[in-house]
Amino acid sequence: MVKRSKKYREAAERVDRNNLYTANEAIALLKSMPSYNFDQTVEAVFRLSVDPRKADQLVRGTVNLPHGTGKTAKVLVFARGPKATEATEAGADIVGDDDLIAKVQGGFLDFDAVVATPDMMGKVGRLGRVLGPRGLMPNPKTGTVTMDVTKAVKDIKGGKIEFRVDKNGNLSFLIGKMSFDESALDENFKAVADEVKRLKPSTVKGRYLTKATITSTMNPGVPVDPNTLA
């Protein structure tokens, strides 16, 4: 059994496990918990009644957080020639082609998001086993396989995040930092919840979003009533 710190136990005592909170209430409760000497990350976690093994129930997409994540993403771009120059000018942190592909194949993973031009995907596809499990594989559906590398890089730097349901039907989102105002965290949470609801597969009958939680790096999760997200 994991031994929790005194601060964690104190925070956990504030959460009524017989109650489901609104997002506003959950965020306010989270911010009232004991503080730490660093700016904690705040996350939202959803449980969906989907079967990710079925292609038509693999919920994935992107969402632009109105207040960003509180973290500037390190963006890697696979491109060559003028598009490589364009990516660098747009603010990409790492840009390259064949040599960079080899570097990633060799274990280099110091980046948070990946963009590729379509002509690079034949070779980038070899990185599926490296990037896929980490949710980093470029995909046209999420705007990360594109000729408009400027827009892709600026969107990611501006707070655009990519998500994909895991094998257990869970979705996790970074929605900001504990230093954010409650209203900013609430608006970021609403943005991700609205996008998840919009992507409900037509083959899913009955309740789709079955559980929601807001949590932070060092504190327990606060359960949010899914009915308040309708």
Swiss-Prot record:
Subunit structure: Part of the 50S ribosomal subunit.
Record keywords, A-Z: Repressor, Ribonucleoprotein, Ribosomal protein, RNA-binding, rRNA-binding, Translation regulation, tRNA-binding
Gene behind the chain: rplA
Keyword Isomerase: no
Gene Ontology cellular component terms for the protein in this record: large ribosomal subunit
Functional summary from the UniProt entry: Binds directly to 23S rRNA. The L1 stalk is quite mobile in the ribosome, and is involved in E site tRNA release.
MF GO annotations: rRNA binding; structural constituent of ribosome; tRNA binding
CDD domains per the UniProt record, alphabetical: Ribosomal_L1
Keyword field contains Repressor: yes
Protein name as catalogued: Large ribosomal subunit protein uL1
Leader sequence residues: none
Any one GO biological process: regulation of translation
Family listed: Belongs to the universal ribosomal protein uL1 family.
Family annotation (PANTHER family): 54S RIBOSOMAL PROTEIN L1, MITOCHONDRIAL, LARGE RIBOSOMAL SUBUNIT PROTEIN UL1M
Superkingdom of origin: Bacteria
InterPro entries, sorted: Ribosom_uL1_bac-type (IPR005878), Ribosomal_uL1 (IPR002143), Ribosomal_uL1-like (IPR023674), Ribosomal_uL1/biogenesis (IPR028364), Ribosomal_uL1_3-a/b-sand (IPR016095), Ribosomal_uL1_CS (IPR023673)
